Amino acid sequence: MEILLIFLLALVIDMVFGDPPNAFHPVAYMGKVISLFERAGFKGGKGYQFVYGIVMVIFTMALFFVPVYFLLDWLQGINSIVYIIVSAILFKMCFTVTGLRKAALLIKRLLEKDDIAQARFELRSLVSRDTSKLPQPKLVAAAVESVAESIGDGFVAPLFFFLIFGVPGVMAYRVVSTFDSMVGYRGKYEYLGKFAARFDDVLNFIPARLSALCILVASFFGRYSPAGAWRIMWRDHGKTQSPNAGWPMATAAGALEVCLEKVGHYSLGDDIRPLLPQTISCSLVLINNAGCIWVLISVGVIYFARIA
């Protein structure tokens, strides 16, 4: 029963309060630790950087996993209510729904006002690509891509690892995800971030595909195309550089009947409907419904695991 209460309370906290300020957010501190360790990672050659990257990931995972594990174990033995509340707060900090929704809706409102310059600026908080010259359709596409991809690593994956490993496990997952977002790139971080990038790919392998299935089911509710979601999911999921990101993005593109293109990298879906500011709202409804489906599945897993 405790795990179900933690799960549901964390969702309520997200809906009511959203994301906490960076001063209280563990992901912000993960980023600071990574930046601190990163400086010493370039002192040697390729082999040194690769090994250093492995040690850096494992050490940082332990740095957040171990204190959280013992803190919650101690609280559980003292007061179950305090244990549930603290666990829910920590768990909520490992996933995001409300914050992304607000950011996407802000971009939609700016585009509706034809404030392209400000929309480009705000979009930088959602994507890593250069937004300075993107026209409106590409801005919409980038926002929709971010919304679709986020359900995988931002919601389904944290809940998935919570069900298996509890709050400490989600913290460890979030460390790897943060590493990947900061150093999991080619070029400068080719060897330093290689382990983090591959580890993140492995951890998100199942959640990414589960998120695509949730989007597919959600496409049956509303003015979406389930047939398109199914077809594009299988046709285009492998077009992205990431082995995981393409699954939810391609499925969403098919359901929305739009083409999501990152110029020079990939093109997902067919250009059946135009990319309009309203498309962002449609994508949010689709992804929210997919998230609700995953919540129902998770609650079912918790319930049947309890009575088994």
From Swiss-Prot:
Subcellular location: Cell membrane
Cited Pfam families: CobD_Cbib (PF03186)
Broad class of where this protein is predominantly found: membrane
GO cellular component: plasma membrane
Pathway annotation: Cofactor biosynthesis; adenosylcobalamin biosynthesis
Keywords for this protein: Cell membrane, Cobalamin biosynthesis, Membrane, Transmembrane, Transmembrane helix
Function per UniProt: Converts cobyric acid to cobinamide by the addition of aminopropanol on the F carboxylic group.
Membrane topology: Multi-pass membrane protein
Source organism: Dehalococcoides mccartyi (strain CBDB1)
Coiled-coil region(s): none
Residue intervals passing through the bilayer: 1-21, 50-70, 71-91, 151-171, 202-222, 284-304
Protein family per UniProt: Belongs to the CobD/CbiB family.
Record-given protein name: Cobalamin biosynthesis protein CobD
GO biological process: cobalamin biosynthetic process
One GO MF term attached to the UniProt entry: ABC-type vitamin B12 transporter activity
InterPro entries assigned to the protein according to its UniProt record, in alphabetical order: Cobalamin_biosynth_CobD/CbiB
Statement: the UniProt record of this protein carries the keyword Membrane: yes
